[in-house]
Amino acid sequence: LTTPNGLGLEDNPTRQLIDEFGAKISIHLLLNTVITRHCEIIKAYAGHFIQAHRQGIEHAKTVYSVPITGHADITISSSYPADIEYWQGLKGLFSAALATKQGGGILETTPCPEGVSVMHPQWIEYLQYDTATLKDFLTQGKVEDHVAFGLALNVAHIREHHPVFLIS
């Protein structure tokens, strides 16, 4: 249930499920765009849904990726511009986890003016648990919001490898 952080990896379990589903429903064409933070199109790719997606990824890496030459003892991260609520602010945490040494600390800053999660109120309850407890909830059928559960499981996994501090 807990896999390594898939951020920036085109071959991750979620992507595999999407590609499998796309093949089942016979998607014939995908128009994939790489955009700026102001939603301006930089480049567009069209064609087979997997190939157009992968081409877009390769271009997006040149625009949005930052090379990391080593892992930090402490990483300070901002969620900007995804900071309306903590649900969105996690993008900063996931990026920081990739840049931080095992056991190293993460300090995330995010304003979250709308709180933790407007659309997934149960998520705040899930966030208090470790991965073992969350997995027990799943096997016992106690999970109502599977999207919130999955994200809480990812956060728990990061917290088990890094002390995390949030300033909001």
What are the residue ranges of the model-derived segments?
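Histidine- and/or cysteine-centered catalytic micro-motif in compact active-site loops
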Residues: 34-36, 79-81, 110-114
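Short, glycine-rich nucleotide/cofactor-binding loops
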Residues: 79-89
